[in-house]
């Protein structure tokens, strides 16, 4: 029970920090937020409850959507949908902000992932992104132990691949 409380507290603190860091705290209540890879909706609920945002969470997992709906009070402006992050069913510029935490590492096409998030973001909107990345492995080759860890993440945990922050930045700047 103690560890669960610590995890929840850390999750809430993390969301508040990412909101401040990304500028989402400048948005008015009622702003439309897309939570890409929402899981069971933890971040979505915090964004709706503490900031008054209207949050749409998407995940490819029907089980996660079901659980997110079970955990979310009808008083919160949150809705959850089963949807592929690489094929978002929203019009261009629908959202004031796009939020994505630890989803990109699961995407096999990082360019399409970025394209879809940026396409649904209104001009001048905010992108809040926190994810697993690797350093530039050509410039800074991994140690033997790091190679083993990467192998485990890619093969046993079935992550498609990791890219560096620099590589992801290039994708974003291409827009």
PLM features per residue range, with description:
Residues 150-167:
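Acceptor-substrate binding/catalytic loop of class I
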Residues 97-109:
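A short SAM/SAH-binding and catalytic strip from SAM-dependent methyltransferases
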Residues 111-126:
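A short glycine-rich, Lys/Arg-flanked "PGG" loop and its adjoining helix->strand segment in the class I
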Residues 1-6:
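Short, small-residue-biased leader/transition segments that mark boundaries at the very start
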Residues 32-34, 40-87:
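Class I SAM-dependent methyltransferase SAM/SAH-binding core
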Residues 128-150:
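Conserved class I S-adenosyl-L-methionine
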Residues 86-98:
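A short acidic, Gly/Pro-enriched loop at the edge of an enzyme's catalytic core
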Residues 9-29:
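Conserved alpha-helix/loop element of class I SAM-dependent methyltransferases that forms part
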